[in-house]
Amino acid sequence: MGDAHRVGVVGLGVISRAYLDTLAGHPAVRVTAVADLDASRSASVAPGLPGVRALTVEELLSSPNVDTVLNLTTPGAHAEIALGAVGHGKNVYGEKPLAATLAEAHTVMAAAARAGVGVGCAPDTVLGTGVQTARAALAAGSIGRPLFASAVMVTPGHERWHPHPDFYYTEGGGPLLDMGPYYLTSLVHLLGPVRAVTGASSRLRAERVIGSGPRTGERIPVEVDSHVSGVLEHVAGTLTTITTSFDGVATTASPIEVHGEVGTLAVPDPNRFDGDVRLFGLGDTQWRTLPPSAGYV
């Protein structure tokens, strides 16, 4: 094996720990630097990571010891950091969404193409046993020709558990850009590309109340829609209805269901790598769980 691929991490919020722990055990990857707009975060994180330097964001983006920038900033900064990395000849992999707006996403992709560097974006959970087992079942004809599908993500809002949830309710946030990528990536993986979209959205509350951490009880403004419903028309002709909401308390709906001519497939939470894939065939009397047949755990 050659030299380890060198990664610099920008953004040291809640999600960064999962990435740092995973990369620490990967023999082909080495984290060489961390940075955050809040310098105290990088100064506190770096000492716990052997061989990792705490840098400013600009220092990390231009560092000769970084091959790929792992962009874990809040959504509103995704495009800015990605463009900075690309401008210094770095590959960039970021948390979802790729950018806060479609125009910014196009700008990032165009800049990367000109620079000859790679751009990647979460989610990678689509490679797990949940979605991959479902895809294998569809390919095997377990439900016949897919006719329509549904996707549902309902939560009262991340402010209940996240100590600094402001970004969920500003540009680049909201349920569709925050959680929707897991569902949309899986739907495209299972049913193919989408050629047309219809949607509607609403904003039911002007404020949210933080429910944990040092800011408990603080009210934050809601600047984006918190409920989004849509219909996706896949190229193959399948129709998918999708609901993503920060306004519902709970749901009994499967995260994703695909209905075919001879059966229905229930797909587990696409925000996870695993989970049971269940099949109800025409003439069956109950659901049955399919054994994992593909993907990574």
Regions found by a protein language model. Give the residues of each.
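Conserved SAM-binding strand-loop segment of SAM-dependent methyltransferases
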Residues: G51-E59
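Hydrophobic residues in well-ordered beta-strands that form the structural core
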Residues: Y93-G94, V119-C121, S150, I242, ...
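Beta-strand-loop-alpha-helix segment that lines the small-molecule cofactor/substrate pocket
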Residues: D67-T68, T74-P75, A79-V126, G141
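N-terminal Rossmann-like dinucleotide-binding module
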Residues: M1-L49
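Core-facing hydrophobic residues within beta-strands of well-ordered domains
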Residues: V29-V31, V66, P146, V194
